[in-house]
Amino acid sequence: PNPSASAYTAETDPEKCVACGKCVETCPAGAVRLGQKLCTKEGPIQYPRHELPDDTKWGEDHWNKNYRNENGSIQTWPTGTAPCKVACPAHIAIQGYIKMAADGRYADALKLIKKDNPFPAVCGSICRKYCEDACTRGSVDQPLAIDEIKKFIAEQDMKAEHRYVPAMNSCTHEKFDQKIAIIGAGPAGMSCAYFLAIEGYSPVVFEKEAAPGGMLINGIPSFRVGKDIVKSEIDVLREMGVEFRCGVEVGKDVTIQQLREEGFRAFYVAVGLQKAAKLNIPGEELAGVQGGLDFLRSVNSGATKELSGDVIVIGGGNAAIDVARAAKRLTGGSVNMYCLEKDEEMPTVPDEKNAGIADGVVINNSWAPKAILGEDGKVTGIELMRCVSVRDANGKFAPVYDENETITVPCSNVLVAIGQRSEYGAVLAGTAAETPDGRLIAHDVITFQTAEPDVFVGGDCATGPKYTIDAIASGREGAVSIHRYVNVGQ
């Protein structure tokens, strides 16, 4: 039949439309188009009308001299792109690789992912899943399992006889000869190296530990992401020409100035936040008290294989959940988490919290540590007081306690996972780079450049504690800025 002469007309229910595009694909007459005004969970976006050039008097009020720093005045609409892509810090073309995977084009899907993310297999296991939070399908029933799809695509590549190695972007296929040093082989540093390699550089990554990986190897338990997966992803970087110099601490074994003398033109500092925050309460010096990050390092290295007795974990974030789950696997005793926040206020991702509960971790809300108790230099228990509120009316961290309501819990181990602090050593010695708050390295928010022109920063030491996907995005931005710095005009 001739579809254009059909007596039937299409009927749509706007309340059920999720902008999946299926009607566009199947309409035999090609009469349906999917425009840029995508719907959201709150309904279609209403765009304001723009002034027309011939109706505008172009005075100073229509000219923004500082447009690079205030580009919010430029009327670009993130909602014109798939919400999942907008929500992803790395801006991966999620809607694209899902479609390719649906068509069985797994190799093409992987190539699309790796344009923006060098570690899809790792992220498939530990990603924050901002994309699923924004998925429009969630307004109908539940979001697509985007992370699982990405993980499946990456697994196909890992099973392949020949791994996919991204090609260099250079039109001339000639490498840039400028030497770039990256300090820190965590997700941000390796991401920067990856995108510089794609651009045509041969970056050198300096890592003080014995192997690259940073928190992916040392800080995240192997039951969340296998170390073989991390190492497999790192091997691809080596094939791309990235050089790793492990066991070298910049600032101690070699300085930035010495590296300059060796011909390095730019530096990307991504050393993370390596020091566990302390409680600063009585008894913290007792044997059996350990920082959560130090505990995870010890577990991942194989130095700690078991714990004796009951364990108390202080903290309510994802790191605290990791610590508690790791401890549960090493002790025959109980593992209890105590945090300041109420259940609905906990900063941990719900999926991670549920995984901890499934493992047998008991979460106790609205309690703050008051003192760690001990005998003969060893932990015997902990005294806690009720936490009434965590933040003030302005949302600032300002916990309020009721010291009249306390409990004492016996235990043999106290693991503290309440945050991370900086431990830069002498990595910035001899440079103008600063840490004004004693924690993060000051930098330009767009270029990640410090007060020392050839020194750039990224990852947690620039932004504060965030997720792996945020570090990956930070590494890419750093690579772009470094490329423009060493090749003026690019």
What kind of region is each of these model predictions?
Residues C246-E262, S366-K378, C387-V390:
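A conserved short coil-to-beta-strand element within the FAD-binding core of flavoproteins
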